[in-house]
């Protein structure tokens, strides 16, 4: 089964980055939140917008327009477990180019879909582009609210913040050992790797610069409690965009600690001559355990990576990997999503976009099974999919995956088996 949320804004690019659906209206169904960060106001200002749709009916529950000129409000839209105390999920929306004191420092705002009101607002004052990436961090201060890791990668070196989910205040700031740039471009929550009982984090800097100015690309694993560097990796070929995407992976080497996926999708390869790569590193030792390459140069393989559940029945969570610029025949940037066994590396299935230039697989997130059967589901974005004759609108498709032992004998669901859409 699949369901579709279609954008409505011409060139709005619905779903640049979105989080796992959560129930915001109390009907027992997980609802979908996403933004169209390029929505125009006053003809030229890319203020952006964000909205929440019912997971049951597809009806729009709440929508907001960005209020900061050119701020890209809706660049990230993250559903978060109850922040306001009303028992319902709320949303955090990023406007990473929102002006503060005349600079594009960025603003993060938490809002209630139930009332539409602002719960808190945090404006960056030190670095720039606050909210370029963010992820749920768990409850680090014991106040019963989910906190957030938030990247602000621009400025001299970039920063990552641990923000209090209740009021948006800063609990901790993470900075790199050296000011090499773009630290915080991507952040990922990991398991507890240093044994202190708290979830740790991975940070990417795909446009870090060496002393001679050359792009290198870096990734770190940090202790969330102390900020101590646990692991560090880099890539000398700056074309690869190493560290542009990170993800937690199941334990593959048997040491009881989860691993880390670091992508090198080739985002800085303007000629599109190199294939993207995904590398899996040990969370315990930092040693490289796996390395997979895309099927063609320039497809942005591993532009998105997410755990997809155990699809092959081997007891290890497998991966969904996006390649949004995949060429299918003569159609460019159709996009594809690859389902790959984390243990064996075997490709279990592939899905493809509808047409040229729809960028299928740009962003992917896990989702609850809308049918309540406990099967893994994925929400997949086609960032530039046309809608009703309008270009670069964007759509989100929800797919329910069938494991290898489903009662009906069918394997992993494919895109061709879509049965219903939400418009």
Task: Give the role of each language-model region.
Residues 13, 27, 45, 72, ...:
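A generic fold-level signal
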Residues 26-35, 85-94, 142-151, 195-204, ...:
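Acidic/hydrophobic-patterned starts of short beta strands in beta-sheet-rich repeat architectures
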Residues 38-43, 97-101, 154-157, 207-212, ...:
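Short glycine/acidic-enriched loop and turn motifs that connect beta-strands
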Residues 37-38, 82, 96-97, 139, ...:
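Flexible loop residues that form catalytic
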Residues 16-26, 75-83, 132-140, 185-195, ...:
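Beta-propeller blade termini
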Residues 1-13, 32, 47-72, 91, ...:
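Blade-edge motifs of beta-propeller repeat domains
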Residues 9, 25, 68, 84, ...:
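Surface-exposed coil/turn segments at beta-strand junctions on protein surfaces, enriched
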């Amino acid at each position: 089964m699949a369901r579709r949320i279609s954008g409505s804004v011409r060139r709005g690019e619905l779903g640049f980055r979105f989080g796992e659906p959560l129930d915001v209206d109390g009907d027992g169904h997980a609802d979908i939140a996403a933004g169209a960060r390029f929505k125009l106001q006053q003809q030229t200002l890319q203020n952006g917008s964000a909205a929440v749709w019912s997971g049951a009916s597809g009806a729009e529950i709440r929508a907001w327009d960005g209020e900061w000129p050119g701020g890209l409000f809706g660049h990230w839209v993250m559903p978060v477990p109850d922040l306001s105390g009303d028992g319902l999920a709320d949303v955090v929306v990023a406007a990473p180019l929102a002006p503060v004191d005349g600079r594009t420092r960025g603003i993060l705002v938490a809002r209630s879909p139930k009332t539409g009101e602002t719960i808190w607002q945090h404006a960056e004052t030190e670095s720039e582009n606050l909210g370029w990436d963010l992820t749920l961090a768990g409850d680090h201060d014991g106040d019963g609210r989910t906190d957030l890791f938030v990247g602000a990668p621009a400025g001299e070196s970039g920063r990552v913040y641990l923000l209090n989910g209740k009021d948006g205040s800063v609990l901790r700031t993470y900075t790199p050992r050296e000011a090499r740039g773009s630290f915080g471009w991507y952040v990922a929550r990991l398991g507890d790797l240093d044994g202190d009982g708290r979830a740790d984090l991975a940070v990417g800097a795909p446009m870090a610069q060496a002393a001679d100015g050359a792009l290198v690309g870096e990734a770190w694993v940090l202790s969330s409690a102390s900020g101590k560097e646990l692991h560090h990796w880099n890539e000398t070929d700056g074309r690869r965009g190493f560290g542009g995407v990170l993800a937690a992976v199941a334990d593959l080497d048997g040491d009881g600690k989860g691993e880390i996926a670091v992508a090198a999708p080739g985002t800085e390869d303007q000629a599109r001559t190199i294939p993207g790569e995904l590398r899996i590193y040990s969370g315990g030792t930092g040693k490289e355990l796996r390395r997979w390459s895309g099927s063609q140069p320039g497809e942005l393989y591993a532009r998105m990576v997410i755990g997809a559940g155990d699809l092959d029945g081997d007891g290890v969570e497998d991966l969904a990997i996006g390649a949004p610029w995949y060429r299918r025949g003569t159609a460019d940037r159709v996009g594809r999503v690859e389902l790959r066994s984390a243990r064996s590396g075997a490709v279990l299935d592939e899905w493809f976009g509808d047409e040229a230039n729809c960028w299928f697989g740009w962003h992917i997130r896990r989702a609850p099974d809308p049918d309540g059967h406990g099967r893994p589901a994925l929400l997949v974005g086609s960032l530039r999919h046309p809608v009703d004759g309008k270009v670069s609108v964007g759509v989100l498709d929800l797919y329910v995956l069938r494991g290898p032992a489903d009662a009906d004998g069918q394997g992993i669901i494919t895109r061709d088996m879509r049965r219903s859409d939400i418009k």
